[in-house]
Regions:
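Conserved nucleotide-binding/hydrolysis modules and their immediate coupling elements
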Residues: 43, 181-182, 186-309
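Residue-level preference for the first positions of well-ordered beta-strands
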Residues: 33, 59, 159-161, 206, ...
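Conserved small/polar residues in nucleotide/adenosyl-binding loops
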Residues: 313-315
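ASCE P-loop NTPase helicase motor core
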Residues: 1-122
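Structural beta-sheet core signal
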Residues: 62, 162-164, 293
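Charged, alpha-helix-enriched surfaces in structured cytosolic catalytic cores
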Residues: 41-45, 49, 55-64, 72-76, ...
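Conserved helicase motor core of P-loop NTPases
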Residues: 66-232
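Residue-level signature of catalytic and energy-coupling elements of molecular machines
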Residues: 37, 65, 92, 166, ...
């Protein structure tokens, strides 16, 4: 979206008719080579816009994992292109993120092959902890996040991500966020808090942008508060920390990666939700030092092969 200089739309819910790309056949991209990563997330509308903005002679290199979830929008472009066999395809087999003997790697391959995964806890990067009920599962999740995993992976509890296939239920996003908020960012007289759309937010909460907002302004400031860089756009899946809630101004200040500060009006907080736990789908395109995946049965459609595979490859 940013490469093609989207203009006009505010969120991912807008229709295709309300937004357009500045880059097209009349004002194409000025590049000899265009490389697109995480291509499984591209739908047919975005692919069409991309091709219109590329002039003949430009090389287009597409990088993606066909085993990940397809785009939220219509189409399964990456898979269809590979199956159509009309362009050159190179399959990469060597993995650099984990060691070859990693159980993460082994189990990811087994999931793709439809085989039973190994639960032997034979390597330090993959642990399976069995519990019989949701209360016991939640207790283990809290212990892992707050005590056991941070020293094991040398990361803050805020960097460790809980992934779950569903939003509802005891092990869904909504309930897990309430529980984890109590442990990771408990109420304190020194923290301002406020409820928006039925969810309690407080200063120092971990949050996620859940809609593409191409117009919202962000700034980067020095320690003295002087702005040295600014721009627009916060996107679906971006995570940050609430630094300040200002009741007088009716604003919530969120710091995103690379020090980008965004001032949300209270009316814009429908674009935000707690992010101690997120759905597996929302995690696509991200990477974490460790993840915790609480699963206790459920509908088969929520425990599909591509969801389990996607949850493993983020580490």
């Amino acid at each position: 979206h940013r490469l093609l200089e989207i203009n006009g739309g505010v969120s991912e819910g807008d229709t295709q008719g309300t937004m357009h790309f500045e880059r097209n056949e009349k004002q194409p991209l000025e590049a000899d080579v265009v490389i697109i990563d995480e291509f499984s997330m591209v739908d047919i509308y975005l692919m069409n816009a991309l091709l219109r903005a590329i002039v003949p002679g430009t090389r287009l290199i597409i990088v993606g994992d066909v085993n990940q979830l397809p785009s939220v929008g219509p189409g399964n472009v990456l898979k269809d292109m590979i199956q159509a066999e009309f362009c050159s395809v190179v399959r990469l087999h060597r993995i650099f993120r984990q060691a070859a003997e990693s159980q993460i790697v082994m189990n990811a391959h087994r999931i793709n092959s439809g085989e039973e995964i190994s639960l032997e806890n034979a390597s330090p990067d993959f642990m399976h902890l069995e519990r019989k009920d949701s209360a016991s599962v939640i207790n283990v999740v809290v212990q892992l996040i707050m005590q056991k995993l941070p020293p094991h992976v040398d990361a803050s509890p805020y960097d460790i991500q809980v992934l779950t296939p569903t939003r509802k239920g005891e092990l869904g996003v909504e309930h897990l966020n309430q529980v984890l908020q109590q442990y990771m960012n408990p109420a304190d007289a020194g923290k301002v808090e406020r409820e928006f759309h039925g969810v309690l937010f407080r200063e120092k909460d971990k949050v996620m942008q859940i809609k593409n907002d191409y117009q919202i302004r962000w700034t980067k400031k020095t320690s003295l508060g002087d702005v040295y860089e600014e721009g627009t756009g916060v996107f679906n899946g971006d995570t940050g920390i609430i630094r300040e809630i200002i009741p007088v101004a009716e604003q919530v200040v969120v710091e995103f990666e690379e020090g980008k500060m965004v001032e949300y009006e209270y009316s814009q907080m429908d674009e935000m939700e707690l992010a101690y736990a997120i759905t597996i789908h929302k995690s696509q395109g991200s990477e974490y030092p460790a993840i915790v995946l609480p699963v206790l049965g459920g509908p088969k459609m929520l425990l599909g092969r591509n969801l389990l595979y996607l949850s493993l490859i983020h580490i």
